[in-house]
Amino acid sequence: MSSGLTDTIIASIVTVLACGLGGLPFVFVKDFPEKWARAGWAAAGGLMLAASVFSLIIPGVADAGINPVALGILLGALMMAATAVWLGGQEVEFSGLSVDNSRRALLVLITLTIHSFPEGIAIGVAFGSGEIGLGLVMMIAIAIHNIPEGVAVSLPLRAQGVSGWKCVGWAIFSSMPQLIAAVPAYLAVMAFRPLLPYAFGFAAGAMIFLVLSEMIPESRHTERQRLSSAAAGMAGFLAMMLLQNIFVI
């Protein structure tokens, strides 16, 4: 095994485990009142919207123009819509949750897992370029970026009654595609490089659809909750935006 491939695998493992750090605080959260649960949905939605804009759409457009990204967004949203319709007709059960909560939890996991594929490609392409410095910068940036994404996975799961350690496990699981995608991207860097803008758009479309169709409606039931949810959503959005300003993916 070449040293470059070994570096790619190690970097991917680091970024995957970093996502689990975002779920770790929820191990120590024993009670999750409804008002905090709804604020959690909103905050996670804000994190996802900011990640969609600043780590997916803007870099994709800067790299290849708007058309590939727009096509990816459309396909990602259509895929999530089809998935939501399909899950709505199934008696799904996830981690002991009710049918409705299981459906939402699965949609969150599917969306964040999809989001991890282009990040894995980015890691593989960076190390495959032969610039070890670029690969290390990409690893650090994505690892730091993955911590709030682990929060985004864990918040809605913990709010619905999933245990803290399971939240950590599912956060790590949602980032596993980074390892899966990084290796072939490293081995075939020239073939995977043109796919990044489409993959970025696809992941952004899936996340934006989830936020608009599930997370925002779930966070708003009363007038008072609408205000607190808006504040939580803005806090999540601003936190991720500031993070992206420091570590651009």
Q: Where does each model-flagged region fall?
A:
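Intrinsically disordered, metal-sensing/regulatory segments
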Residues: 1-249
